[in-house]
Amino acid sequence: YKLICYYTSWSQYREGDGSCFPDAIDPFLCTHVIYSFANISNNEIDTWEWNDVTLYDTLNTLKNRNPKLKTLLSVGGWNFGPERFSAIASKTQSRRTFIKSVPPFLRTHGFDGLDLAWLYPGRRDKRHLTTLVKEMKAEFIREAQAGTEQLLLSAAVSAGKIAIDRGYDIAQISRHLDFISLLTYDFHGAWRQTVGHHSPLFAGNEDASSRFSNADYAVSYMLRLGAPANKLVMGIPTFGRSFTLASSKTDVGAPVSGPGVPGRFTKEKGILAYYEICDFLHGATTHRFRDQQVPYATKGNQWVAYDDQESVKNKARYLKNRQLAGAMVWALDLDDFRGTFCGQNLTFPLTSAVKDVLAEV
């Protein structure tokens, strides 16, 4: 099974023990590590951070210790406007320029492939995304004729039914991609007026709106649309989503007044790294959604949906049962990468739990 792990370059800026550089990554933990994110400037792939080139090198040095490790560079992301992708992909010339710029950039910096993180293509972008994927793959095939190992091509795809229907020709893009990472962890956020889990494995009985909003539905839907199981990778989060409660109610459907308070290290409302959640759990009340098979915790007026070792192991068992290609983890730097927060003296407790299940016969 593949275990595809994202690393985010901005995690270097978190203070103190939250700061994560690629040398913190265990080279044997994942089969693939994806560096997020690269930029596009003048229609060519480019660095984003001032020190990206140094960090690329630090990451790719991990392959000295584990020569089997593959690394990919992800282009795009949430802060990269989807309309910028549209502009490049919709015109033959700019698309050509972008595609041509990719192999030399990846080779120069020691990457094994490219991950497309166009979040998210709109209705008009559907055929342009297909063309981009098809032409990028053709370029990778052409480039490998020189005798080098062919570059890998993957894509991160929304797990929401509406977004899938709108932006992706799944059957077509699947033919040209080496794997597809399904972002099965953004099903519920602080934009909702009530509490709910962002990464349930199955639908909840209580919640009519959750019929489509769970990993099981998304996986089944993708397979039905023509994604081959052996190319489909299921996303598992190492972060939680937090809410500020608007009343004393804490169960399903409890009203919220907004996102939860920012974490000490990640400093973003409504989101917490697993290592911050381990801190939060001291003195908190924990619960589990039996049907959705994911935990949540409350303390004061804060309500946090998250994943723990039990829930990620369940998800790993599920994807093995569905005979998928493997699991994807977002992100290594949000797991307890130092092993100092979650009390087991174990680095990357969630990612390791997934790895353990994938390794079981």
Swiss-Prot record:
Q: Name one GO cellular component term.
A: perinuclear region of cytoplasm
Q: Which residues are glycosylated?
A: 39, 345
Q: Which GO terms of the molecular function aspect are on file?
A: carbohydrate binding; chitin binding
Keywords on record: Antimicrobial, Apoptosis, Cytoplasm, Disulfide bond, Endoplasmic reticulum, Glycoprotein, Inflammatory response, Lectin, Secreted
Source organism per entry reads Ovis aries (Sheep)
Source organism, top-level taxon? Eukaryota
Localized where? Answer: Secreted, Extracellular space; Cytoplasm; Cytoplasm, Perinuclear region; Endoplasmic reticulum
Q: Name one Pfam family in it.
A: Glyco_hydro_18
> Family, per the entry?
Belongs to the glycosyl hydrolase 18 family.
* UniProt cross-references to InterPro entries, sorted A to Z: Chitinase_II/V-like_cat, Chitinase_insertion_sf, Glyco_hydro18_cat, Glycoside_hydrolase_SF, Glycosyl_Hydrlase_18
Name all GH18 domain ranges: 1-361
Chain spans, region Important for AKT1 activation and IL8 production: 302-316
Q: Which GO terms describe its biological process?
A: activation of NF-kappaB-inducing kinase activity; apoptotic process; carbohydrate metabolic process; cellular response to tumor necrosis factor; chitin catabolic process; inflammatory response; lung development; positive regulation of angiogenesis
Q: Which Cys-Cys disulfides exist here?
A: 5-30, 278-342
Instruction: Identify the coding gene.
Output: CHI3L1
Gene3D superfamilies with a match to the protein in the record: 3.10.50.10, Glycosidases
PROSITE patterns in the cross-refs: GH18_2
Q: What is the role of the protein in this entry? A: Carbohydrate-binding lectin with a preference for chitin. Has no chitinase activity. May play a role in tissue remodeling and in the capacity of cells to respond to and cope with changes in their environment. Plays a role in T-helper cell type 2 (Th2) inflammatory response and IL-13-induced inflammation, regulating allergen sensitization, inflammatory cell apoptosis, dendritic cell accumulation and M2 macrophage differentiation. Facilitates invasion of pathogenic enteric bacteria into colonic mucosa and lymphoid organs.
> Which tissues does the record link to its expression?
Detected in mammary gland.
The protein depicted here goes by the name Chitinase-3-like protein 1
Oligomeric state and interaction partners are given as:
Monomer.
Binding-site residues for chitin, renumbered to this chain: 49-50, 76-79, 120, 183-186, 241, 330
